[in-house]
Amino acid sequence: RTGYAPTDVNEWLRVLSIAKSYGINHYRFHTCCPPDAAFTAADVLGIYMEPELPFWGTIAAPGEEGYNEAEQNYLIELGDKMLDTFGNHPSFVMFSLGNELWGSPERLGEILRHYKDRDSRHLYTQGCNNFQHFPLMVPEDDYYVGVRLSKERLLRGSFGMCDAPLGHVQTERPSTMHQYDDVIFPKQTEGEGASDTEEIEIQYGTGVKKVQVSKTAGGLIPTKPVVTHEIGQYEVYPDFREID
């Protein structure tokens, strides 16, 4: 076994039905697109699917350092094929340009416009958790996916120390009452102390780099719906009795 995705509808019905029984109605496919059987099963069960271009890196604009025309043309063509092949499925609701991308917001917007002109039936986003500590939206975004809206305005419950501060799952008593309303639209904006900066190490493409980030920057006030990114990244103690 290689860990490949199932390609028969019944297996996807089984997997997605389990998720639906937990109250899950949305699947994001990290840097990949599932097979036709997955969309067919999701059509039946009412699961909102988000396939994604197979890219985790930097999208530079023409003329910028790191611009790779062949790479970008390949990715754009691959996205065209995904839309043409699977786009008629009603479960194909959302589409992302990749995972934790860096580079040119303007170039990301151009690519989104290309896809929207080709197939306007779907909701599109520049990527999932792009620009990490420097969240932004481009005009072409239909929704935003990320883990934070500023250094302190966190959109999920747990973080590694490299992405500190930690989240409410790690710092507060267990609760089912936590809300993100005040994070998305803060009642009072944070201070403007732009000179109050610190150096942090961030993931950049497939490597790391050190950048200066404001400790008190107000961050992003989203104008479109918000989806939290990779919320399950924390350890739990399994109940082995569930195996049976």
Q: PLM features: residue spans?
A:
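Substrate-binding/catalytic cleft of secreted carbohydrate-active enzymes
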Residues: 26-244
